[in-house]
């Protein structure tokens, strides 16, 4: 069934605090503003911040909204997110399924991005993106198959 991303998840766009609050002494929350430390599934951290405006929580999907648009990682810690990321939290689908459906539709998100030099996607375009969403049983099967 076709649904928008906003119907199956909540989208929080990142916002960068002043760099005066950044550190590499692990004070405050880990801070990500793009995909430079993304791994295959989870990011690593090289910057922390003692002040933040926007956050991601364990289980959220981290989604790049600036070039490259559409890279995803799973959030396993409470972190601060900057302008290059959105935190997407599943509301009506399985969290791990949300990760897979976003990953599978990366080219669709890239096509919806704009910008002549640096591609980006805004919250409205992201939340209104139409996705083919599987039933709860199919989601469970997909998650189980992908984890195996």
Question: Can you say where each PLM-predicted feature lies in the sequence?
Answer:
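Sequence-specific dsDNA recognition surfaces
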Residues: 4-21, 30-58
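Short coil/turn segments at secondary-structure boundaries
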Residues: 18-26, 114-115
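Short amphipathic beta-strand starts and helix->beta connectors
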Residues: 70-72, 112-115
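A short glycine-rich beta-alpha junction/loop motif
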Residues: 79-86, 115-143
């Amino acid at each position: 069934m076709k649904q928008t991303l906003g119907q199956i998840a909540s989208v929080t766009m990142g916002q960068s605090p002043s760099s005066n609050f950044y550190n590499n002494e692990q004070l405050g929350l880990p801070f990500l503003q793009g995909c430079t430390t993304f791994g295959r599934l989870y990011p690593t951290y090289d910057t922390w911040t003692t002040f933040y405006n926007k956050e991601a929580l364990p289980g959220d999907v981290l989604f790049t909204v600036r070039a490259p648009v559409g890279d995803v990682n799973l959030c396993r810690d409470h972190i601060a997110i900057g302008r290059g990321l959105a935190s997407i939290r599943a509301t009506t689908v399985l969290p791990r399924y949300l990760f897979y459906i976003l990953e599978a539709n990366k080219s669709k998100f890239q096509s919806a991005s704009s910008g002549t030099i640096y591609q980006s996607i805004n919250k409205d375009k992201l939340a209104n993106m139409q996705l083919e969403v599987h039933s709860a049983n199919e989601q469970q099967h997909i998650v189980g198959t992908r984890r195996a």
